[in-house]
Amino acid sequence: MKQYKDLCRHVLENGEKKGDRTGTGTISTFGYQMRFNLQEGFPMLTTKKLHFKSIAHELLWFLKGDTNVRYLQENGVRIWNEWADENGELGPVYGSQWRSWRGADGETIDQISRLIHDIKTNPNSRRLIVSAWNVGEIDHMALPPCHCLFQFYVADGKLSCQLYQRSADVFLGVPFNIASYALLTMMIAHVTGLEPGEFVHTFGDVHIYQNHVEQVNLQLTRDVRPLPKLRFARNVDSIFDFTFEDFIIEDYDPHPHIKGAVSV
């Protein structure tokens, strides 16, 4: 995707070398935005092969409100293992905040259900927002949310989504995040009777780890190939009824996978 290669170049050319929590070191910039028209294909990176199974199962895991890695491990997904405790628990991370936000009066708020209800009943609302950044619970999370807030927008029968990501690992994380939120937008559009519009990806601290520079430069030498298509295998009425088997990726022809170490 041209948008992704442009981001890589921007960080390499304009970034500052900074230390970071993990001790790895980064090349970092602050503030950047990419836009993807979901009518033009499913934005899954082609300059390296992505593991769609991990992307899809992680999203389904979020939507279940689950915060234990057991479901992920049972489905061959290991991306959260480094942060889990000995029982597989991560604390009140994404799934908990999306589905069981603890309100000021002790009530539990299902942000996803409320979001879908509001899209259906008040599509012009400017409050179609889900937040994972629960200040009162940050210290209890294994990893505070990197992709921390997203908003939906309905116009001309199309549903668009904008994500704010406070911290973005360009090589490992960002390709997953793009595909995950594009998939979420398409799923919500499906259950609300809308067409997918745009996915807008807005960053705070967007960085390339020092031990990923070689891999990023390799991707910049690779040509951008046509985007794949994503379709659903059946009609689904509820966002919570989707399964992995409902997602069909067609015409995905990426360059080979590139390995990179995770900074924990």
Curated annotation (Swiss-Prot):
Any Pfam family the entry gives: Thymidylat_synt
Amino-acid positions noted as binding dUMP in the UniProt annotation, renumbered to this chain: 21, 126-127, 166-169, 177, 207-209
Annotated binding of (6R)-5,10-methylene-5,6,7,8-tetrahydrofolate, by residue: 51, 169, 263
Top-level division of the source organism's lineage: Bacteria
Record bears the keyword Cytoplasm: yes
GO CC annotation, single: cytosol
Catalytic site positions: 146 (nucleophile)
Alphabetical UniProt keywords: Cytoplasm, Methyltransferase, Nucleotide biosynthesis, Transferase
Class of enzymatic activity (EC top level): transferase
Catalysis performed (reactions): dUMP + (6R)-5,10-methylene-5,6,7,8-tetrahydrofolate = 7,8-dihydrofolate + dTMP
Entry keyword annotation includes Methyltransferase: yes
Cell location: Cytoplasm
Function, as annotated: Catalyzes the reductive methylation of 2'-deoxyuridine-5'-monophosphate (dUMP) to 2'-deoxythymidine-5'-monophosphate (dTMP) while utilizing 5,10-methylenetetrahydrofolate (mTHF) as the methyl donor and reductant in the reaction, yielding dihydrofolate (DHF) as a by-product. This enzymatic reaction provides an intracellular de novo source of dTMP, an essential precursor for DNA biosynthesis.
PANTHER family linked to this entry: THYMIDYLATE SYNTHASE, THYMIDYLATE SYNTHASE 1
Protein name: Thymidylate synthase
Native species: Bacillus velezensis (strain DSM 23117 / BGSC 10A6 / LMG 26770 / FZB42)
Annotated gene: thyA
